[in-house]
């Protein structure tokens, strides 16, 4: 199983380490052609407006949308969650606009207010330590969205079909259960496409 990590900004190496720890192959993606042959893609944290500029500069916007249209799973963490959202509070336009969610940027405060919180994640388990850094949260989730975790009544992890998103940085701890959950999604998608 080959999983790409969008390598424009953010905790790229940590995601690679998590993917490899789960027994899959990780590929850092910086060019559209590097999406070929991948089974799934991780959109890491960073700064969403900077990431958007880099996506545009490297001509990745359409190829990323095509990757999603082909039914390939995508996992967005922190800024990656913002890239996946159809609606962003205070912005007219989304980025990739793939998940039926509304997100608010930096909604837990700025960098100095980074914190860790123990989460219970549906389908993953309890006692998962979420590392929140300038984190967004999901203000509103559409009907087809499965809420996986909340913190202080705010949605911090959700899934819609082939898309998985979370507010926190799962790659910054050694608990790889959420990455394993994503790899299981990828496995299911591969099986489904081979049956077509």
From Swiss-Prot:
Name of the gene this protein is made from? pdxT
Residue numbers binding L-glutamine: 46-48, 105, 133-134
GO CC aspect terms: cytosol; glutaminase complex
Lyase found in the keyword field: yes
Enumerate the NCBIfam families for this protein. PLP_synth_Pdx2
The entry's active site is 78, 169, 171
According to its UniProt entry, this protein's organism is Geobacillus kaustophilus (strain HTA426)
What does the record give as EC number? 4.3.3.6, 3.5.1.2
Q: Which InterPro entries match?
A: Class_I_gatase-like (IPR029062), PdxT/SNO (IPR002161), PdxT/SNO_CS (IPR021196)
Per its record, how is this protein called by name?
Answer: Pyridoxal 5'-phosphate synthase subunit PdxT
State the protein's purpose.
Answer: Catalyzes the hydrolysis of glutamine to glutamate and ammonia as part of the biosynthesis of pyridoxal 5'-phosphate. The resulting ammonia molecule is channeled to the active site of PdxS.
Q: Which cysteines are joined by disulfide bonds?
A: none
Single Gene Ontology BP annotation: pyridoxine metabolic process
Q: Keywords assigned by UniProt? A: Glutamine amidotransferase, Hydrolase, Lyase, Pyridoxal phosphate
**Gene Ontology MF, one:** pyridoxal 5'-phosphate synthase (glutamine hydrolysing) activity
Reaction catalysis annotation: aldehydo-D-ribose 5-phosphate + D-glyceraldehyde 3-phosphate + L-glutamine = pyridoxal 5'-phosphate + L-glutamate + phosphate + 3 H2O + H(+); L-glutamine + H2O = L-glutamate + NH4(+)
Query: Under which pathway is this protein filed?
Result: Cofactor biosynthesis; pyridoxal 5'-phosphate biosynthesis
| Subunit composition and interactions | In the presence of PdxS, forms a dodecamer of heterodimers. Only shows activity in the heterodimer.
Q: Please report which protein family the annotation says this sequence is part of.
A: Belongs to the glutaminase PdxT/SNO family.
Tell me which PANTHER family the record gives.
PYRIDOXAL 5'-PHOSPHATE SYNTHASE SUBUNIT SNO, PYRIDOXAL 5'-PHOSPHATE SYNTHASE SUBUNIT SNO1-RELATED
Cytoplasm listed as a keyword: no
Q: Which PROSITE patterns match?
A: PDXT_SNO_1 (PS01236), PDXT_SNO_2 (PS51130)
């Amino acid at each position: 199983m080959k999983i790409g990590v969008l390598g424009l900004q953010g905790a790229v190496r940590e995601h690679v380490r998590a993917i490899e720890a789960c027994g899959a192959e990780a590929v850092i993606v910086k060019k559209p052609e590097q999406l070929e042959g991948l089974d799934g893609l991780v959109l890491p944290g960073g700064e969403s407006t900077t990431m958007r500029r880099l996506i545009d500069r490297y001509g990745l916007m359409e190829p990323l949308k095509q990757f999603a249209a082909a039914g390939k799973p995508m996992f967005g963490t922190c800024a990656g969650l913002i890239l996946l959202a159809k609606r962003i509070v205070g912005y007219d336009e989304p980025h990739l606009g793939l998940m039926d969610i509304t997100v608010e940027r930096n909604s837990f405060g700025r960098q100095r207010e980074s914190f860790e919180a123990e989460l219970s994640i549906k389908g993953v388990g309890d006692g998962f330590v979420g590392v929140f850094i300038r984190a967004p949260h999901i203000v509103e989730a559409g009907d087809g969205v499965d809420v996986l975790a909340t913190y202080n009544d705010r949605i911090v992890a959700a899934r819609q079909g082939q898309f998985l998103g979370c507010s926190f940085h799962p790659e910054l701890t050694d608990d790889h259960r959420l990455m394993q959950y994503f790899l299981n999604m990828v496995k299911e998608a591969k099986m489904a496409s081979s049956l077509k």
